A protein has these predicted regions:
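Charged catalytic cores and adjacent phosphate/nucleic-acid-binding surfaces used
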Residues: 1, 5-8, 59, 82, ...
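Conserved acidic, metal-coordinating active-site core of Asp-based
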Residues: 38-103
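Flexible, glycine/proline-enriched loop segments at strand-loop-helix junctions
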Residues: 2-11, 36-38, 74-75
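Residues that form generic nucleotide/phosphate-binding pockets
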Residues: 7, 19-22, 26, 51, ...
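Conserved phosphoryl-transfer catalytic core
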Residues: 10-37
């Protein structure tokens, strides 16, 4: 577990360093210094978004993600995650239940999404987050069907990060589609 956590932290730091290089090329300096002063271990794009706001580069977190840190953002850098079997084994070794979080946010087409969920199930994954903030009901239904096809639990989540975020409040989410609600986990 410690090795996986250390690798995840290293990957987050490398991603921040890549974003920092892009910012420097645009004349914006100080990101790494800012991040090193924060009282956290897991650097995230939320921290970088706050740096962009503080520096007058972005107007809001929404603007920071849409224009600079999202998939097509000006300063974006790819995330580096561990392999699915490693993630599943680590979660289960710690006594957790391995749930694939918000899969419709990974910018995958239906074929790749189906493949991801199938691979996750084959690696011992136990569930998929089907209902989460602002997900289209048709996509929720599709996610529920993929859970059933792969014998996975259907999970829900609000994707709550902080009261300042506007997309959803803690504990608020849409109900699971009826066809997958019999095999649900919270």
């Amino acid at each position: 577990r410690d090795r996986v956590a250390a690798e995840a932290e290293r990957g987050r730091r490398e991603r921040a360093e890549q974003i920092d290089k892009r910012l420097q090329l645009a004349g914006h300096t100080g990101l790494m210094r800012y991040l090193e002063q924060l009282p956290c271990q897991a650097i995230s794009r939320n921290h970088i978004a706050q740096f962009l706001i503080n520096g007058g580069i972005a107007r809001s977190k929404d603007h920071a993600f849409k224009s600079y840190l999202g998939d097509k953002g000006k300063y974006t850098a790819a995330a580096q995650w561990c392999e699915i079997p490693v993630a599943v084994a680590t979660i289960q070794a710690a006594g957790g239940i391995a749930i694939l979080a918000h899969p419709n946010r990974y910018s995958l087409n239906k074929v790749k999404l189906r493949r991801l969920i199938s691979e996750f199930a084959e690696c011992g994954g136990q569930g998929v987050e089907v209902s989460y903030s602002n997900l289209d009901p048709d996509k929720m239904a599709h996610m529920g069907t993929l859970c059933i096809e792969n014998d996975l639990w259907a999970s829900t989540g609000s994707d709550f990060h902080t009261p300042k975020n506007q997309w959803m409040d803690v504990g608020r989410f849409r109900h699971l589609p009826a066809h997958c609600a019999q095999k649900a986990i919270w």
